[in-house]
Amino acid sequence: MVPLSWSILLGVALFVIGAGGVLLRRNILIVLMSLELLLNSVNINFIAFGQYYDDFRGQIFAIFVIAITAAEVAVALGILVALVRNKSTLKVDDVTIMKG
């Protein structure tokens, strides 16, 4: 069995990489992938703590997060396709559709 500290360390490392991608990158696709990395790192920690405390609720919550993430990705990719068709760019700074 893998020690809990290794799983937490993996989750924290993935979370830091994902947060860095969300905060530092300007490409919307990279930001979306970094957000997915953030959510998957949280899932790793849910499953690790559920396994450590011998409780299945961590796995169930991780499945719910995966389902919500799949819906979020579907909506975000639809918006991304419409954005590329209208603006021909994926840069966050160039997108000013909501600006009034």
UniProtKB/Swiss-Prot annotation:
Record's bilayer topology term: Multi-pass membrane protein
Main localization (coarse): membrane
Stored Gene3D superfamilies: 1.10.287.3510
A biological process term (GO) from this entry: ATP synthesis coupled electron transport
Classification via Pfam families: Oxidored_q2
Membrane-crossing segments per the record: 4-24, 28-48, 60-80
Single annotated GO MF: quinone binding
Enzyme class per UniProt: translocase
Any one of the GO CC terms: plasma membrane
InterPro entries given in the database record: NADH_UbQ_OxRdtase_chain4L/K (IPR001133), NUOK/Mnh_C1-like (IPR039428)
Signal peptide span: none
Taxonomic superkingdom: Bacteria
Keywords of this entry: Cell inner membrane, Cell membrane, Membrane, NAD, Plasmid, Quinone, Translocase, Transmembrane, Transmembrane helix, Transport, Ubiquinone
EC number: 7.1.1.-
Catalyzed reactions: a quinone + NADH + 5 H(+)(in) = a quinol + NAD(+) + 4 H(+)(out)
Localization in the cell: Cell inner membrane
Family per record: Belongs to the complex I subunit 4L family.
PANTHER family linked: NADH-UBIQUINONE OXIDOREDUCTASE CHAIN 4L (PTHR11434:SF16), NADH-UBIQUINONE OXIDOREDUCTASE SUBUNIT ND4L (PTHR11434)
Function: NDH-1 shuttles electrons from NADH, via FMN and iron-sulfur (Fe-S) centers, to quinones in the respiratory chain. The immediate electron acceptor for the enzyme in this species is believed to be ubiquinone. Couples the redox reaction to proton translocation (for every two electrons transferred, four hydrogen ions are translocated across the cytoplasmic membrane), and thus conserves the redox energy in a proton gradient.
Subunit structure: NDH-1 is composed of 14 different subunits. Subunits NuoA, H, J, K, L, M, N constitute the membrane sector of the complex.
Protein name (record): NADH-quinone oxidoreductase subunit K 2
Organism this protein belongs to: Sinorhizobium medicae (strain WSM419) (Ensifer medicae)
Organism ancestry: Bacteria, Pseudomonadati, Pseudomonadota, Alphaproteobacteria, Hyphomicrobiales
